[in-house]
C-alpha cells in the first residue's frame, strides 16, 4: 500500500497531466478515493498549499505558456483550462500575477 506522501505525489502528477480537463476538488477526490474534506486536509499537510489553490495556480501557469507562445484568444485559453468565463479567468489571473492576461 502506498504511503500518503506517495499518494499525494501521484495525485499531483495526475493533476498536472489533466490541466486541460475540468478539474475540481470533487473530481480529484474521486480520483484519489478520499472524501474531499480528507483529501484537502492531507494535501495541505503534505504540500503546505490548499488543493484548490494548487489546481488554480497550475492552470494559471499553463495559461501563461499558452498566451505567451500562441495567438490564441484569451477566452479560448480560459475555457480550455476549465474556467467558467473569461471574467473569472481574468480575476484569478490578476489576483495571482498582479496584471491582466492580455499583457502576456
What are these regions (language model features)?
Residues 3, 7, 24, 31:
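Conserved acidic
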